């Protein structure tokens, strides 16, 4: 019983560490490297007719998330 609990604890720690290290949303590529981000930012820019929004979306993760959220509400 103690051995199985120890194994489960170790597995949980490994999964938590991997999840934290590899699924950070701030690791998303910028517009130059990521097609999904580029398309989302272009759609957001078309809706606002402000070129500054495209630049903000490409450079700032928070602006990208906000843009994606606003686009999903319109659908």
Curated annotation (Swiss-Prot):
Contains 3 disulfide bonds. It comes from the Eukaryota. The keyword Signal applies. Expressed by the venom gland. Coiled coil: none annotated. It is found in: Secreted. Residues 1-23 form the signal peptide. GO terms for cellular component: extracellular region. The keyword Signal applies. Keywords: Disulfide bond, Ion channel impairing toxin, Neurotoxin, Potassium channel impairing toxin, Secreted, Signal, Toxin, Voltage-gated potassium channel impairing toxin. GO terms for molecular function: potassium channel regulator activity; toxin activity. Gene3D superfamilies: 1.10.60.50. Inhibits voltage-gated potassium channels. Belongs to the scoloptoxin-03 family. This is Kappa-scoloptoxin(03)-Ssm1d.
